[in-house]
From Swiss-Prot:
Gene3D superfamilies from the UniProt entry: Metal-dependent hydrolases
Uppermost EC category: hydrolase
Any one of the GO BP annotations: purine ribonucleoside monophosphate biosynthetic process
UniProt-annotated binding residues for Zn(2+): H14, H16, H212, D294
Family statement drawn from the similarity comment of this UniProt entry: Belongs to the metallo-dependent hydrolases superfamily. Adenosine and AMP deaminases family.
UniProt-recorded name of the protein: Adenosine deaminase
UniProt-annotated catalytic positions: E215
Originating species: Xenopus laevis
Length: 358
């Protein structure tokens, strides 16, 4: 296991597939498909796609333009990034991961507009999900960890959301466990009812729900996620603490916050001083939250970076890390029987199995 700050089994709930691709894989498919990259060595490519000092969220999102054309619209590439993702997480000591992505961003057919300036091809969002599932399942068998997926709606593309929820339903028993909403938080659901309708359908069909909210946006976005979209978890949620009443209500309801410390620094989502990070407040209040990488390719990170920040700047102890991972497992979108199995694995690894006297 790679992690040094917490060298025990971990659970990760907030990480993007398209932000977790190996640079070598990007270069391989760019060459194979004759797609021009900003550089053709790993070091050169990382200079363009990875960074270490805070940028705005918009500048961060522009990083994807450099490399996604090499991966999107290629069956082998889509399967491979899913497989290699599981390999990467296994090396980090993760035993259960929920990975999220927008099927439309990897497609080149039956998607409007076609992303990344691709020519029209024959890979639909539906086939993308099937390809990712194949890669994840193969990775699970090879690396002996459990991986599930979350399909993302994009705030600026409400016309995609009805298909996202249909794909969640179609693949509900085949790695897909939930729906997510990502993108520009200033685009609310009042103006873009496509998302609200998709989430209403999710509630009706028993599909789990998480929403990116309060990352750079105000607490009102979190409120909308909970009240309108019926979110069961909040992606990031840092700015929730600015509305004491909302924060108190979410604490009382045991709402789970998917916290990504290093990401929040590099996207300027939070104060650059980690001692002032909302996670320190969450920790103090014994809130329900997890620690996650978000986009490790772009942030040049592993899960150990986030755990190290929590130790060095926020004073987290090993017992608190155990609690964080147990909360992550409890808040995972696994069916109850699989959740119990996961929790048992953690309790066992953490030396927390109590003798029942049987």
């Amino acid at each position: 296991m790679e992690s040094k700050a917490f060298n025990k089994p971990k659970v990760e709930l907030h990480v993007h597939l398209d932000g977790s691709i190996k640079p070598e894989t990007i270069i391989h498919f760019a060459k194979k498909r004759q797609i021009k990259l900003p550089a053709d060595t790993v070091e050169g490519l990382l200079e363009h796609v990875s960074y270490k000092e805070p940028l705005s969220l918009t500048e961060f999102l522009q990083k994807f333009n450099h490399y996604m054309p090499a991966i999107a619209g290629d069956r082998e590439a889509i399967k491979r990034i899913a497989y290699e993702f599981v390999e990467m997480k296994a090396k980090e000591g993760v035993i259960y991961v929920e990975v999220r992505y927008s099927p439309h961003f990897l497609a080149n057919s039956k998607v409007d507009p076609i992303p990344w300036g691709q020519k029209e091809g024959d890979i639909t969002p539906d086939e993308v999900v099937d390809l990712v599932n194949q890669g994840l399942r193969k990775g699970e068998k090879t690396f002996n960890i459990k991986a599930r997926s979350i399909l993302c709606c994009m705030r600026h593309m409400p016309n995609w959301s009805s298909e996202v929820i249909e794909l969640c339903k179609k693949y509900q028993n085949d790695t897909v466990v939930a729906i997510d909403l990502a993108g520009d938080e200033s685009l609310n659901c009042e103006s873009y009812p496509g998302h609200r309708k998709a989430y209403e359908e999710a509630v009706k069909c028993g599909i789990h729900r998480t929403v990116h909210a309060g990352e750079v946006g105000p607490p009102s976005v979190v409120k909308e996620a909970v009240e309108v979209l019926k979110a069961e978890r909040i992606g990031h949620g840092y700015h929730t603490t600015e509305d004491p009443n909302l924060y108190k209500e979410l604490l009382e309801n045991n709402m789970h916050f998917e916290v990504c410390p290093w990401s929040s620094y590099l996207t300027s989502a939070c104060h650059p001083d980690f001692t002032k990070h909302p996670a320190t407040q969450f920790r103090k209040d014994k809130a329900n939250f997890s620690l996650n990488t978000d986009d490790p390719l772009i942030f040049g990170s592993t899960l150990d970076v986030d755990y190290s920040i929590a130790v060095q700047h926020m004073g987290f102890t090993e017992d608190e890390f155990k609690r964080v991972n147990i909360n992550a497992a409890k808040s995972s979108f696994l069916p109850d029987n699989e959740k119990k199995e996961l929790l048992y694995k953690l309790y066992e690894a953490y030396g927390m199995i109590l003798s029942t006297g049987l």
